[in-house]
Amino acid sequence: WDGTDSYYLPFESETYTAYTSSNIDFDTNILRYGYQSLTTPSSIIDFDMVTKSKTIKKEQEVLGGNFKKENYTSERVWATALDGTKVPISIVRHINTKKTADTPLLLYAYGSYGSTIDPYFSTVRMSLLDRGFIFAIAHVRGGEYLGRQWYEDGKLFKKKNTFLDFIACSKYLIKNNYTSAKH
């Protein structure tokens, strides 16, 4: 460390997956990392720590040739569980899909064994989004999305929190007009 101020990498979305990657040159100013979000295909990026510039080295191809990430939008919202705990929800939709009671929504969750459902890019999911669906991931307790305690608070005698979190997320999405109970 050279004593300079901290710097945070600028990510395009508030809900994403990022990880450091390998670089065979250990004496370099380049940080290589992987990045993807609900709207951005998996990418390998070189970040120059001196100039603060980035270069996309590789991005997952989306077959069909019609994909444009600017046609989709994602967000992170927080539902309040029965015990007052804030539960994150990652949401993605096509920009032409409005949040109304008539909009179909697929809510997905997995809260067990500490497994985390990252907000990742899926070409299969694009088919739903292009047909007017909203897709949401409820990051319920039982996974480790918010750390080890998040996992502990969703297992054994606290397992019911996983299901109560999912219900709270469903109610939040209905109350905030993303969809309705009929969907």
Predicted regions located by residue number:
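Conserved blade-ending motifs and adjacent loop-strand segments that build the rim/top face
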Residues: 7-21, 61-68
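Coil-to-beta-strand transition motifs
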Residues: 4, 39, 84-86
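Cap/lid segment of the alpha/beta-hydrolase catalytic domain
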Residues: 49-53, 58-183
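Short beta-strand elements that form the blades of beta-propeller/WD-repeat-like
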Residues: 27-36
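Structural motif
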Residues: 39-46
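Structural signature of eukaryotic scaffold interfaces centered on beta-propeller domains
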Residues: 21-27
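A structural motif specific to WD40 beta-propellers
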Residues: 6-7, 55
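Short loop/turn segments that connect beta-strands within beta-propeller blades
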Residues: 1-4, 49-50
